[in-house]
């Protein structure tokens, strides 16, 4: 290969023309030959330099060497499309390598299949995240790369934009910056047979130590979902930037985004001392830790606020508040952060009942500790001293937190260490704009080991459309994060139906009217204890099932359904609705208050509509059969 590169370099003389090579390698992960295109600086053969690498992920119907089918003037590799603002032109004037992998995922040998990456649907056994790490190792072994995370980035368009953010969030220990040109916001991913919905707006905690950039277009068909994502990431994700161009779906001003990566290479973020991670796979590495499980069902494993002092763990069906999966077994190995062959005091708190288990565990020869847990919620503390963590919170005096109004929270603080904490002062902070904190300081009493206390937070969000607010409880220089979902002021719904095993004509896939039965119960149109219901809001001559929110103790909201709108807007995303259960112990006459949200189609600018719902829990009437609508 060196001879070929040298001849190509000599053939272009001293012009800074890049070398664009189409190559193959044998993948052990896939058990097949895979293609890639590599863009090398024009003087690569003679410079002796090492280069940072941007891994590029193409979109639907593209290949490593082919632009999108049936859409002319979309070649961003090289040439004069996009006014010549292409990968090749950028590499020709910068010290960087770009590797464009091949997302080809044929279901049968040699099939001309346009859908890449084996996502939505997961229909083969090719797992591209596992192949990505193999490709990185191959490129580092065969080209003069600067082979560390600080000099490695991802970028991509459309489905490739989704992949860029997914790979950077799955492997932040390998990648220091990620960009996304108008990427799809949501796909099902993971092992075939138990793939799970992966929605970027809910995955913002995966990017500790990573700079991120989202490129949007004023005429892009995905722009509604991008704005939804920005509304979350802007207030929860540091080192996130976004840029909107007057453009339709594509790669406008590519050099602006590649310049973002060059700046990130020059000033990479350090490895985070505290990090969080969410993963769709049962087994995965992250920041030197290793997680394994016996999970054979859709779910997401969550490690939160991980440091040498401990972590929070759980496995859920969906984020942020899907059903926990305590039947799943987890085996977690820490990074080698502890003195080899020395014992550490480990405190484990099972949050559902506060049960505390404390053991002395010996680190192995590599300084790693090992933990066996299940998929329930746990706080794990490591060390002999006090270790504080924030637990659950409750909105006081209201069923949800409202924009523009004072919000009072009761927040639980745990001591997951092995010694009592001393009485001190807790300080509340936020980096969010237009947020006033009414209780910037609160006294925090002594907390016994394994115990908890409650504190309060009073705040007001002055933005009428904020969807989330993030705060930090600062105690003795330790910053403990908490994120609060926010909701706009909304009028009471003038009309709605309670579907408790009864049929109605509802919209599915955005605009299709379909007769469906929702919920399970006696079908009398009232909410009874023990029933599963849906709230249906009228839209013309049919109904839309609502996504619901409340902190009411009588309501179990852990079941959420996704209505795929791909056939309507071609994005791959979905509208959500809830199937809450009225808990069996809920008394007759108890009044339930809920915030209802429906997604109204108007491609590409859909609209979210909010309304409040109120109904009493009724005495059960005579029952008849009803079945629940599922995805």
Where are these regions (language model features)?
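C-terminal beta-strand-rich structural cap/linker in extracellular carbohydrate-active enzymes
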Residues: 364-389
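Terminal connector regions
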Residues: 388-393, 404, 460-495, 580-621
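Short, solvent-exposed loop/turn segments enriched in Ser/Thr/Gly
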Residues: 404-410, 453-455, 468, 529-536, ...
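Non-catalytic cap/lid and distal C-terminal segments of serine-dependent acyl enzymes
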Residues: 16-326
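Acidic, glycine-anchored loop motifs typical of Ca2+
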Residues: 399-402, 505, 516-532, 563-575
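Short acidic, flexible loop segments centered on an aromatic residue
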Residues: 414-435, 439, 538-556, 595-598
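Intrinsically disordered, low-complexity Pro/Gly/Ser/Thr-rich segments with frequent PxxP/GP/PP motifs
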Residues: 436-464, 553-586
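Surface-exposed beta-strand/loop patches in extracellular or lumenal glycoproteins
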Residues: 321-340, 426
């Amino acid at each position: 290969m060196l001879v070929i590169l040298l001849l190509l370099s000599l053939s272009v003389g001293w012009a800074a023309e890049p070398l664009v090579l189409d190559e193959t390698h044998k993948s052990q992960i896939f058990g097949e030959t895979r293609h890639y295109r590599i863009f090398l600086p024009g003087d690569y053969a003679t410079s002796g330099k090492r280069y940072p690498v941007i891994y590029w992920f193409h979109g639907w119907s593209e290949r490593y060497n082919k632009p999108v089918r049936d859409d002319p003037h979309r070649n961003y590799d090289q040439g004069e499309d996009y006014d010549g603002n292409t990968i090749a032109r950028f590499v020709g004037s910068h010290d960087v390598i770009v590797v464009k992998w091949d997302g080809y995922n044929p279901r049968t040998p040699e099939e001309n299949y346009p859908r890449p990456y084996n996502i939505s649907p997961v229909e083969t056994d090719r797992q591209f995240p596992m192949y990505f790490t193999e490709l990185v190792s191959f490129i580092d072994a065969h080209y003069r790369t600067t082979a560390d995370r600080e000099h490695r980035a991802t970028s991509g368009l459309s489905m490739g934009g989704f992949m860029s953010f997914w790979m950077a969030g799955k492997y932040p220990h390998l990648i220091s910056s990620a960009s996304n040109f108008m990427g799809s916001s949501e796909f099902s991913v993971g092992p075939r047979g138990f793939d799970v919905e992966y929605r970027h707006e809910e995955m913002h905690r995966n990017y500790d130590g990573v700079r991120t950039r989202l490129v949007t277009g004023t005429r892009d068909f995905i722009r509604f979902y991008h704005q939804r994502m920005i509304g979350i990431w802007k207030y929860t994700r540091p080192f996130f930037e976004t840029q909107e161009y007057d453009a339709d779906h594509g790669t406008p001003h590519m050099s602006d985004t590649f310049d973002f990566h060059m700046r990130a290479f020059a000033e990479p973020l350090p490895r985070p001392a505290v990090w969080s991670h969410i993963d769709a796979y049962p087994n995965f590495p992250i920041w030197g830790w290793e997680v394994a499980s016996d999970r054979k069902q859709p779910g997401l494993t969550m490690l939160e606020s991980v440091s040498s002092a401990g972590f929070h763990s759980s496995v859920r069906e969906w984020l942020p508040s899907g059903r926990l999966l305590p039947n799943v077994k987890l085996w977690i190995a820490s990074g080698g952060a502890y003195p080899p062959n020395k014992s550490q005091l480990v405190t484990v708190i099972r949050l559902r009942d506060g049960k505390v288990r404390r053991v002395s565990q010996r680190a192995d020869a590599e300084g790693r500790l090992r933990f066996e847990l299940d998929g329930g919620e746990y706080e794990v503390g490591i060390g002999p001293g006090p270790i504080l963590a924030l637990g659950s919170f409750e909105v006081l005096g209201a069923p949800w937190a409202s924009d523009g109004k004072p919000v009072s929270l009761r927040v639980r603080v745990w001591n997951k260490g092995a010694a009592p904490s001393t009485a001190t002062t807790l300080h509340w902070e936020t980096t969010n704009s237009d947020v006033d904190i009414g209780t910037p300081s609160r006294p925090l009493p002594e907390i016994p080991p394994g115990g908890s206390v409650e504190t309060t937070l009073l705040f007001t969000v002055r933005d009428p459309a904020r969807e989330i607010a993030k705060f930090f409880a600062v105690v003795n220089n330790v910053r403990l994060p908490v994120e609060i979902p926010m909701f706009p002021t909304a009028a009471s719904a003038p009309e709605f139906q309670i579907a408790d095993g009864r049929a109605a004509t509802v919209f599915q896939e955005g605009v299709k009217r379909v007769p469906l039965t929702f919920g399970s119960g006696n079908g009398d149109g009232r909410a009874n204890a023990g029933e599963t219901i849906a709230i249906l809001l009228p839209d013309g001559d049919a109904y839309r099932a609502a996504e619901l929110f409340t902190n009411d103790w009588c309501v179990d909201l852990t079941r959420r359904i996704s209505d795929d709108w791909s056939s309507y807007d071609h994005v791959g995303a979905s509208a959500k609705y809830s199937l809450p259960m009225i808990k069996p112990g809920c008394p007759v006459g108890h009044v339930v208050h809920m915030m209802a949200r429906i997604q109204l189609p108007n491609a590409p600018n859909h609209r979210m509509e909010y309304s409040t719902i109120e109904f009493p829990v009724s005495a059960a009437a005579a029952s008849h059969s009803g079945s629940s609508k599922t995805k």
